[in-house]
């Protein structure tokens, strides 16, 4: 039963610029029953704020899809700021590292599934599903992870434990219920997903909460329910009732599990018979051993590693039927908002086949039952069947969105701040690097930042090396930098730790960098994906948040894509300038707080334990840097600027040797936790060393 709550925007600002007209028109179209609506919103016009005001008008649960974790985190924080009294949740993949199970037949190589789960993100995923099943005023900001299989909402709800003061619940019966839904008893280490018992008091940290729950019994009657701080035990608030949701999304009752095991055994027998008929005895033995082990684990503890591969049987679905996903947790009238739709829509459509090609190999060679193929992302057709009314947000809507809306769109190109689209200057390629260096120095002297986008990784590396030699504080952003490191890198750019960021295809959608006053596009006349009109407009938008923003395109000819991008930018400039003149607006620079956009989403515990490195007295800290520590962070995954904080390659290599010796010594002394910490530091430093080698840095 979902509790009704009203969406309420709390903001010091009122809709301005194009926002009032856009909100009115979006509301009108949705209330008129239009299934697909496109909002063409230029960079910096406040599309996120428009989304929040639209949600307030419509009063409907909303799923906001973003193309990656970084933009999803940015959106979630913006919406949380505007909807502070409502549930704004964050749902992305909870893997920090993920190596999927695979089999390479050509080399007879089996790759076991290996992953590292981010505990905070897993909690946020559970928080999203529990909120969706218990209230209506919910906005979930999600990546494409929301189309992957999840346990069914009915099982998740049915297996939840409802508690209320004065209810008769035997204490031991409650403990058994908690164990059945994968909570573990641990009276020593009190962590998320565990519970502890002290006489007539049971304390639980639910899988979706930061706070603990205390249940006080008087005999078999619940006497009181509290939320408390798990570390200090301080009572935060007392409640009359609450519901404890399972610790995993894959839960089933004893009857359902017994039926699932029976169905798995039946499928196993059929598949073994098929393998034996074909003379594939190795595959048959492989499948028999693995599946029987998993069945035994499910019988004994109700769970096994890789249980998601049996989700079809656990859910009671037929062969080929789609799995339950986050979409199934929403009520029927939910609104879908797809941010950066020109990227997100193709992404949704491409997930199924990539997943399926890997699983077919596992099934064919006896590593998995055929039903494992039904643990998969939705196809585009299945996704389209599950969604209702959709708002597509983009500065450059794609062909699919425009075809769905009949070519019509709602336009939002005027910025309330009065900021004008950047001036686009086309320059010849002859002497382009010298010209670029001159422009960089001019911006650096004015405490402004520069983005440079190239076509190839090699060119980006060479340019970074050259700029370093010229004494410019520069770093290079590439595809191997993981999401959280990328966020830290962008934050350092804003803080002024360096002046120039060189990239390839990473400086586009959604990057919010008000300090950037120049975007340089090298080889702008090379037609292709990275220099299409849509890509150029997105790249130009990175300079649209600065009063003196400019875009320099280095090219010898002006292509059709360049013409289209420049004309569209000029059209938007003219419209904004006319609005500013009519309303007496003097464009003001954006003053956005420089903070890690993931701070509110990832509440990582600060690990300020230090590791002494050799005799140099240098302290290297894992996790976030303590306030008192030097600025240098270990292995940010990019090339460090060659300033005094940077470490030469030879010194870095010596440091790795030093740490390796200390790791071995710690292991010999049976100090395994310390040794593990050394091991992690060494892995980070080796990654940085490889990066330096790739860049040719000494």
Curated annotation (Swiss-Prot):
One of its GO terms (molecular function) is excinuclease ABC activity. It comes from the Bacteria. Residues 653-688 form the UVR domain. CDD domains: DEXHc_UvrB, SF2_C_UvrB. Coiled coil: none annotated. GO terms for biological process: nucleotide-excision repair; SOS response. Its main location: cytoplasm. The keyword Lipid metabolism does not apply. Residues 609-629 are annotated as: Disordered. A motif (Beta-hairpin) lies at residues 94-117. It holds the Pfam family UvrB_inter. NCBIfam families: PRK05298.1 (NF003673), uvrb (TIGR00631). Forms a heterotetramer with UvrA during the search for lesions. Interacts with UvrC in an incision complex. The beta-hairpin motif is involved in DNA binding. This is UvrABC system protein B. The lineage of its organism: Bacteria, Bacillati, Actinomycetota, Actinomycetes, Mycobacteriales.
